[in-house]
Amino acid sequence: MKCLFGFLFIMLVAFLQDVHGVDSCIGKPCKVKGEDMKDIKEKKIEDIKEEIKNVKKEIFEDVDDELLDDNIRDDKIRDAKPSLRRVHWTRIRPGIPAVIKIGSSIGKK
């Protein structure tokens, strides 16, 4: 009787591994549906890097449009008081800088 339950348990484990596409991970890298986990991680990292680049482009395009809409030109900023020449940066997400204010009181005591 114990042999029958043991055999059924082994068959159940083998069936579940087959259904989910997971190869045995003993002594070798795990695979999910035929792909190495390392390859999957590298693809995700590349996708995240590409998304960050796209977000950076969108942010700077938006900032440029806002500056042009407000008719703020370089000569106006140059002629302004020294405190108005400062451009302050903040981080929306780590690694993505964005201009938030021109000529603010940030940093003044």
Swiss-Prot record:
Antimicrobial peptide with a broad-spectrum antimicrobial activity. Keeps its antibacterial activity under a wide range of salt concentrations that mimic physiological conditions of human blood, which is surprising, since Hydra is an obligate freshwater animal with nearly no salt tolerance. Does not affect red blood cells. Belongs to the arminin family. GO terms for cellular component: extracellular region. This is Arminin 6560. Keywords: Amidation, Antibiotic, Antimicrobial, Immunity, Innate immunity, Membrane, Secreted, Signal, Target cell membrane, Target membrane. Expressed in the ectodermal epithelium. It comes from the Eukaryota. The keyword Lipid biosynthesis does not apply. The modification Isoleucine amide is found at I106. Residues 1-21 form the signal peptide. It is found in: Secreted; Target cell membrane. The lineage of its organism: Eukaryota, Metazoa, Cnidaria, Hydrozoa, Hydroidolina.
